[in-house]
Amino acid sequence: MSRALIPVLTVGVILTACAPKPPEGVDAAALDEAVARAVGSPSTCVVVEKRGGGVVYRYGTHTTCARSLPACDAPGLTTIQVQLDAARTGKVRTASCDTAAEASRGVAWASGPLPVLAGKSDRQMVYAVFMESGDALSGL
């Protein structure tokens, strides 16, 4: 999943040009569709923020993205916001684990800084993603 996700997010960053909305001429629905094909489900959340804060792109509802889910690589729960904050420090993270005792559902996390576009050092961004479902990829 992480290899499929990076190109989608990179394209998303290029298309959104650090604006809360895609630039003129970019179809936000097409970007959402590309994310949906790569990792989408009703329980998927993808957030790209400026390194200093401010949402550039969100896939998933606010309710979905506000969920607290198992951290997988540490005790307790974590959130998209905690992962975005860690990504701002340069931390890259991938983790997955079961969310149901009988292993019927799982969560997969990925987060980190996005590559800086050539000549665009003022456009540093971070991302955080989770997918929680029966289809969440293990060993992300």
Which sequence ranges carry the predicted segments?
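Sec-dependent bacterial lipoprotein signal peptides
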Residues: 1-16
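Non-catalytic interaction/Regulatory regions outside core domains
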Residues: 18-45, 50, 55-140
